[in-house]
Amino acid sequence: MDPLNEGVVNVYLTDSYLKGVISFSETNAIGSCLLGKHYLKKDNTSKVAIESPVVEHIRLRNAFQTRIKEKNLRVVEPVNMQSEVMRNSYTCELNLLKQLITRSKDISSLKLDMICDWLQLKSTSENPSVLKFVDVRCIPDWVSTWFSSWYNLNKLILEFRREEVACTGSIICKTIGSIMFIISSFGCVIKSNKSKRISFMTYNQVLTWKDVMLSRFNANLCVWISNSLNKNQEGLGLRSNLQGALVNKLYEIVDSMLSVCSNEGFTLVKEFEGFIMSEILKITEHAQFSTRFRNTLLNGLVDQLAKMRGLNRKRVSGTVLEGNQYPMYETTLATLGGALKTIRLLVNKNLDNAAELYYIFRIFGHPMVEEREAMDAVRLNNEITKILKLESLTELRGAFILRIIKGFVDTNKRWPKIKNLKVLSRRWIMYFKAKSYPSQLELSSQDFLELAGVQFEQEFAIPERTNLEMVLNDKAISPPKNLIWSVFPKNYLPTNIRERFTEEMFNSSEKLKTRRVLEYYLKDNKFDQNDLKKYVVRQEYLGDKEHVVSLTGKERELSVGRMFAMQPGKQRQVQILAEKLLADNIVPFFPETLTKYGDLELQRIMEIKSELSSVKSRRNDSYNNYIARASIVTDLSKFNQAFRYETSSVCADVVDELHGTQSLFCWLHLTVPLTTMICTYRHAPPETEGVYDIDKIKEQSGLYRFHMGGIEGWCQKLWTMEAVSLLDVVSVKNRVQLTSLLNGDNQSIDVSKPVRLSQGVDEVKADYSLAVKMLKEIRNAYKDIGHKLKEGETYISRDLQFMSKVIQSEGVMHPSPIKKILRVGPWINTILDDIKTSAESIGSLCQELEFRGESLLVSLILRNFWLYELWMHESKSHPLAGKQLYRQLSKTLAITQKFFGITKETDVVNLWMNVPMQFGGGDPVVLYRSFYRRTPDFLTEAVSHMSVLLKVYGKAKEGSKKDFFKALLSVDKNKRATLTTLMRDPQAVGSERQARVTSEINRAAVTSVLSLSPNQLFCDSAIHYSRNEEEVGLIAQNITPVYPHGLRVLYESLPFHKAEKVVNMISGTKSITNLLQRTSAINGEDIDRAVSMMLENLGLLSRILSVCQDDITLPTKANGDLICCQVSRTLRERSWDNMEIVGVTSPSIVTCMNIVYSSSSQLKGITIEKFSTDKTTRGQRGPKSPWVGSSTQEKKLVPVYNRQILSKQQKEQLEAIGKLRWVYKGTQGLRRLLDKICIGSLGISYKNVKPLLPRFMSVNFLHRLSVSSRPMEFPASVPAYRTTNYHFDTSPVNQTLSERFGNEDINLVFQNAISCGISVMSVVEQLTGRSPKQLVMIPQLEEIDIMPPPVFLGKFDYKLVEKISSDQHIFSPDKLDLVTLGKMLMPSTSGAKSDQFWNRKENFFHGNNLVESLSAALACHWCGILTEQCNENNIFRREWGDGFVTDHAFIDFKTFVGVFKTKLLCGWGSRGGDIKDRDMIDESIDKLIRVDNSFWRMFSKVILEPKVRKRVMLFDVKILSLVGYAGFKNWFIDHLRSSDLCEVPWVVNADSEIVEVSAVKIYLQLLRVSSPLRITVLNYSDMAHAITRLIRRKSMHDNVPSISRTLSPAELAPVVEPTVQMNLFPKITFERLKNYETVSGSTRGKLTRNYMVMLPWQHINRFNFVFSSTGCKISVKACIGRLIQDLNPTVFYFVGEGAGNWMARTACEYPNAKFVYRSLKDDLDHHFPLEFQRVLGNMNRVIDGGEGLSMDTTDATQKTHWDLIHRICKDALLITLCDAEFKDRDDFFKMVTLWRKHVLSCRICTTYGTDLYLFAKYHAKEQSIKLPYFVRSIATYVMQGSKLSGSECYVLLTLGHHNNLPCHGEVQSSKLKLAVCNDFSIPRKVEVKAVEANCKSLLSGLRTPINRAELDRQKKMLTLRSYHSSVATVGGSRVIESKWLSKKATTIIEWLEHILNSPKGELNYDFFEALENTYPNMVKLLDNLGSAELKKLIKVTGYMLMSKK
């Protein structure tokens, strides 16, 4: 903050007020002043600095002249010294470093023992610890030298800080090694005695160098530790394996490069990022993707190199530096080459290394940013002539308008109001009336042009009054135009300007002098809340002469041409208003903009996105088109500056219409060109020539006018939304699917499009050409609206996600943890900050090394290294309180030593460093934090930590462990503990500090600042901070028990803002130190308070240990362990003083779970299993969705009133009042209290508010939030990293817990269980080198202690409410007026339809039809999902079923299906045609079959959950035998066909209008009833939840009604006689080849006849089977029956079996055999024996169907497949049958080799010697091939039923001397012989159901028998169908259904007619050939049908030919 009052106006503010920036002009000013000559550049700054320097610089000059007398020193710029400063270490601190690492290892080993004890990993005696791999004796010098450098410089800076605390503005002078430093906070001098050079710089430059040394030390230390660990045991260290010596070499090369290239050298460093990116692309992508990018990049580097020298010479001309040498081009090129080579060696083709190196450029220091030059670059960019294309702008506007329409339809179920409907065509008016919009596929660019003409009416209002939300925007503001000179030091200004300024300053009001938004209001005594609205409505902002724009550099920005614009307060508030309106009203319609997501959400989105675009999940659609995908990451050059009024206004005008304003959203474009832009860097004043008015000063570098473009920080949101709309246009024009995430100019775009792969185009080429084409399209689209893509930062890839510096490839994230710990070090915040905060920061930053299973050990060692350094070394040198801190620490350690009876001091320290900070120890990271990130109860966690620690700590005396807990429980009641409501989110990173004290300091600061405010508003509000909590306490003081949360709820429902936020706004940043410097609010007293706070913290442990009462009994378990949960509860209750209080204590997973490594599924615990079979799981993706139970969300039910009307504050206020009503339900006086609060905060009575409140909250709610208030002694907090929150509805553990806790919500215990389990797996894997297959976490019941919510007694004192809410007026949310309320709740009478049905509505749910309502709501919910899925295939695919499992457990299945069917027909009903027509109904149901399978997966997942299954089996027992979604789909569709229509509830909106109008019309036709329309006000999902809640309350128990009917065995498994089923299979014909030719050219016995057939005729006799029909071409009994007789196996092993048809045939041939089944689990294929189940009725003969196995374990080419083959069945593999389709020949041999390995090594199989057989499918190749070693082929079978043109045969293999497989010619000739000689035989029996299923799947609605009439009916249907233009998803790609259907259907019908008309013939290839030759449309047939459809077609053809008479 820059105070402007005259007394201190010349306060020296260093450039460090822009964090981390090294200012060029300041450096120039310092040097020029000290030398008396121009230093870095000859410009106005150096001139002014020489003529009239500022006082501080003069003081520095005097010091400099007295200290340094030498004359012949060479002057250089700071960067030239970098290399020398970095290498300057005169003392070697190696011993200190060794000592620190050794101690760190000792401390870590104790923590490691704790972890191993908890995880039950016993270490053997000869292997003491993995920590021994880090050997202190051989620390490499690339680690130690950086430590020494940092240590010395840090010591110097600390010394300077101590001086400065004592006496502000001191200067210190000291020599380190060969360099002499003169340091002061306003400038430094460095002189090298070695090279005789001298340089001048800002204090920030020295700090930057210190930080760089620290970063390099941290990085190198990490690399060394990690490599030492990995070398000895892979997986102990980090994933990346950088080489330390090389990293060091890189530092040195770059330092020396910068040292010769000066400041200009940083332009090269900036390009390193791109170079590393090109390395990354080289690893992850195919060549064509990466080379283009790499070449662009290298060209860019060379260009930069060529320019450097010229730039430098130009800059230094006329300065001291002019004579210095500048290296030639070749020298620099060589150095640069060296640096790039080193980077390349470091990356070493490893993606983790590359990701890690991405942090690299922050380790090289920072350039000086030249402010004026940056500003000139901005000016240049704005003057570029733009050529815009009108058509493109119009399309852009149309797309933007469409987005808004979609947004309104989705949120408000209506279009926005439109002024000029007549511009729309009939088609759009139809959408308008139907309240819907077309899907992406139906749009064309014409639509956008048409929509661009639409004008909206006002929909949103501008807030009437300014409220604090608007004000609390921490944006700096510029001084107004006449005070602009306050920015520069007065000495720099000419006298006349100085005098005039003093006068202006004196006359202007206080508020104009400030530079912070908040103070702008605080100091305004005429402030009126209605002013802003007037200012905006009258459009005064457009002609405001006072407007000025001052530009400042962005913090830490490397490039030139990015500046940050500031405006005066008055204009700034208009901008804040515009941004706020956008964020609230328009941004929600653009989900792609990332501005609205938090980090965790963002990370989740990225995970989903990279998952979707992973190369592994590519697939073809139903047309067999390959879906090409690519991702494009673009960066637009000068994004903000490229916008002009023309490009902003196309969309801004639309937003203006919606808000009823004029030019509010692009007003800056209208005013800025007329204002002056000025560079307001303190040390860069303009040349004034004595002119005061800046509008009259002539243009120069750093001051210009007529700025045309946009500027950073203007309307980022609007521009991002324009970019989204532009991509919409591109997507529609090119017919591709675009998924984008945008953040301003940074865009990550995924494109996908189905393409045909033709000759010579493989998948990579298809992806590449799509990427390049789309990149061009995007580039051109941007070009048309005046933007240019940056070449070096735009890249295309197949499968690399890159957003905000996080790299994900193949769906795996590369976290680069070293980047996160570069800044770890002592005093990580600031001087005054608590040592405790510093420790917390070290703790949480080092934890980054553990996330995602990186490395526990590296994190431990690094963390303890710095913590030990901080506590034991740095604490002595604390500038304010070093001695006191150290004394206090020694005292604490002495007491600890005595208490535990420890002999050695080092052991005491080891113990203390592992005691959690909550108890006054030195460990900020409690044990649980390495395993889960959030906890409901910190106290229990700390107790658990102590209990584990004392258990493993062997150095303490007997009994001291118990004594410790007794001491803990005998702590005095805390006299000062009051109910403090913490000001911060309890989950924030870093500690709460002492909650009480912090809020005291904050309150003191805020109150004093606020109460000084002359503005009445703020004055009154200030009282709130001093009194509010006490007052709120009084309202509820008579209510017992006091529930800590109750107070908080009260506190939130009264209109308060949190003090913390205001403090930050005033002081500008969170640190107390800044409060000290920048506000007068804190004085010496506060400093003392802060110091005593630190001392209190350090003495906490000694206070705990000082009292120990022996008579306390500790709660213990049977085995003597402590029950931590109870200890913590007792402690919590005792530490409150004189209040009856309910402390909610939750168990800690560390103590309440026993970890067992076992694979027994009977254990009653939570099972975590490994999801891959590799030895380690590092860097692998886990399962895509959690695999235990379903996730639960807090669901609040809010009526569907028009929420758009409410402001954000009003919504929050309603929620808070809802909470209050919920918590205190039934307490006396509650109604009156609520009434007063409602009137005070919302302005309407409770009665009116009631309908708006959320309907319910879960029991969880109290528990969840109660922990946010806790006693003063125990503040703590953890970073939220991953929260998982599961219901264990279905696991056995649920029973155990329900028995104990009843219906109480036990979620709390488990919200971290999964997260913890996964981390445990990862840690066990790191420590032992292999990860357990499975672990079970078994809850220990006595450790789990859950309290019921309390019952409150007593009554409220509501008299205070009025006072509190009137004190708070500025903070109160907007009032609601009755008109608004009426709009929201009253049904509107307008537009009453004449139709009788519309007027008669009644509620669907009337109190007695609970189950029916639930079933109906759920059915409608699923139908809704269907329509959503068909409309937009969006990236953020939701897991729709989640959270609905419990609801389904209560449904009436009959009603469910009926409503589902009815709703479906209404949603998809006919356009034209009679809806009651049977065909129409069939048509809709058949459409359902074609819906994308992801819907069926979700649906089946929910319905097949055990508890839902139990319920549905009351209606249909068959559900018990269903497995997998395919079977479920058929079963469900059968039910739909036969069910009746039912009444459907329809949702109405706030105006009580029906939402789905068109659907209701069809519904009324359908039912033709006179009963009224049944409606519901809630949306379907909310309704379902609410009713489930009611049902549960009614029956008050969770369990689902038990089965009332007993099942007969026949019902569960209908008896099917296998021998009868045998008749469904045709007889097979085959030829056995015994001794075949091995010469490939053999022509022996070739037949001359060659059939030319195109269709797969081999399926002609397979019409009895639906999913697969292998059993029709091959039979075990026919082929190898004799062998089977000899072997007599009891079990057949089928692998690679698909739908199990061959297995079904074998089951019919051998009725007594059992089966083991395996089939590759692939998303697109069957991995369940559906066909087997269909033929044989049930599955009880399949012993092991492979349930629950992962994909790898079902793949016969993977070793694990064979390892797990005996997991259930323990019989030998006597005969294994393999029908797998292998991609290539190698896979076949892989499978054979693995089979051989298995049968030769397996215990079970080896007992049979070599008598084991494998009967497998093989595709013969051109030449004959040898089998793998020791595998022999006995016979080959060629089947008549194989594809004629293929080379498929079946080979029988056994163990023995290896021989050859048959070759292609051999098999081919045998096939032709079979084809010529044999007819296909027909099965004896026809199964009508199967034939019908085949017909239906070929052509929906096709019925048997197929005759002339049936085909005519189908043709008639086609004409009806063509009205449908909806979009379906077919095989993953979206098509317009009507076109797709008519093409396919007409083709099929024509062929069937041809078959009808053809004669009956023998089924052989002669006849088939004749059929094909007589059919004219063969080409069309083959083009329009995919291979699967052709097979179905032939099956149906076979059935027709067979049934001919």
Swiss-Prot record:
One GO location term (cellular component): host cell cytoplasm
Entry annotated with the keyword ATP-binding: yes
UniProt-annotated catalytic positions: 1263 (nucleophile), 1673 (for mrna (nucleoside-2'-o-)-methyltransferase activity), 1779 (for mrna (nucleoside-2'-o-)-methyltransferase activity), 1817 (for mrna (nucleoside-2'-o-)-methyltransferase activity), 1848 (for mrna (nucleoside-2'-o-)-methyltransferase activity)
Start and end residues of each RdRp catalytic domain: 628-811
Pfam families reported in the protein's UniProt record: Methyltrans_Mon_2nd, Mononeg_mRNAcap, Mononeg_RNA_pol
InterPro entries assigned: L_methyltransferase_rhabdo, L_poly_C, Mononeg_mRNAcap, Mononeg_RNA_pol_cat, Mononega_L_MeTrfase
Residues annotated for substrate binding in this entry: 1696-1700
Domain Mononegavirus-type SAM-dependent 2'-O-MTase: 1662-1857
EC nos: 2.7.7.48, 3.6.1.-, 2.7.7.88, 2.1.1.375
Residues that coordinate or bind Mg(2+): 635, 745
Cofactor mode of binding and number, as noted: For RNA-directed RNA polymerase activity. Mn(2+) can stimulate de novo initiation but it is inefficient at supporting elongation of de novo initiated RNA.
Catalysed reactions, as listed in the record: RNA(n) + a ribonucleoside 5'-triphosphate = RNA(n+1) + diphosphate; GTP + H2O = GDP + phosphate + H(+); a 5'-end triphospho-adenylyl-adenylyl-cytidylyl-adenosine in mRNA + GDP + H(+) = a 5'-end (5'-triphosphoguanosine)-adenylyl-adenylyl-cytidylyl-adenosine in mRNA + diphosphate; a 5'-end (5'-triphosphoguanosine)-adenylyl-adenylyl-cytidylyl-adenosine in mRNA + 2 S-adenosyl-L-methionine = a 5'-end (N(7)-methyl 5'-triphosphoguanosine)-(2'-O-methyladenylyl)-adenylyl-cytidylyl-adenosine in mRNA + 2 S-adenosyl-L-homocysteine + H(+)
Region (GDP polyribonucleotidyltransferase): 902-1379
Domain of life: Viruses
GO MF annotation: an example: metal ion binding
Subcellular location: Virion; Host cytoplasm
Keywords, sorted A to Z: ATP-binding, Host cytoplasm, Hydrolase, Magnesium, Metal-binding, Methyltransferase, mRNA capping, mRNA processing, Multifunctional enzyme, Nucleotide-binding, Nucleotidyltransferase, RNA-directed RNA polymerase, S-adenosyl-L-methionine, Transferase, Viral RNA replication, Virion
Transmembrane listed as a keyword: no
Cofactor annotation: Mg(2+)
Family: Belongs to the paramyxovirus L protein family.
Physiological role: Responsible for RNA synthesis (replicase and transcriptase), cap addition, and cap methylation. Also performs the polyadenylation of subgenomic mRNAs by a stuttering mechanism at a slipery stop site present at the end of viral genes. The template is composed of the viral RNA tightly encapsidated by the nucleoprotein (N). The viral polymerase binds to the genomic RNA at two different sites in the 3' leader promoter thereby initiating either genome replication or mRNA transcription.
Domain text: Contains an RNA-dependent RNA polymerase (RdRp) domain, a polyribonucleotidyl transferase (PRNTase or capping) domain and a methyltransferase (MTase) domain.
Name this protein carries in UniProt: RNA-directed RNA polymerase L
High-level lineage: Viruses, Riboviria, Orthornavirae, Negarnaviricota, Haploviricotina
